[in-house]
Amino acid sequence: KNLINKGINLQTNSDTEVLLNYYILYGEDCVSHFDGMWSFAIYDIKNKKLFLSRDRFAEKPMYYYKCEDGFYFGSEVKFIKSLVKESLEINSEKVNKFLSFGARSLFKDNQSFYRNIFLLKNSENLICDINLNLKKKKYWNPNPKINSKINIHEAIEHSTLLLSNTIKLRMRSDVETAFLLSGGIDSGGIVSIAGNTMSKKINTYSI
């Protein structure tokens, strides 16, 4: 709606077209207008630079690798491996941490299981120019404000409203949506709120 109000005539229903037009309008600051999960790359022909971005909570992955012959990126390491000509060295330290501490260790830093293949961090943009110079920028930091003047009932009401609005926003889709139930309180609560606030059929799956 924001783009249409600015006189931009969208040709498709694709998120990609919306994203591209936001970049044309706002440049690198386009991500400050987004709410959700993303991982994308845009090559800016005019300014001769590659722009990579990852969402605020790192829900979508983005790996990158720089060497003498180029800059490589992808949502999975295997894509980079298939393109890089030189042999990649195993990152033994990262492997040992994973074997010792499990999946929690994967997100403690930007290292991958291969040396020099890095993971773009949450809320981070990366610029690669034609000389392969890299520049990273943190575009968002949480700023929790504690209001100790509200009582427990007001806090519950406010939190419920925030959660309901967030779920409603995430359920915007051109196709049917579905929920994966784990059997726990979190997923069950989300489905319950979705069912109460949306006039859509709720499809659920349990594995």
Residue ranges, per PLM feature:
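Cysteine-centered catalytic environments shared across enzyme families
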Residues: 1-207
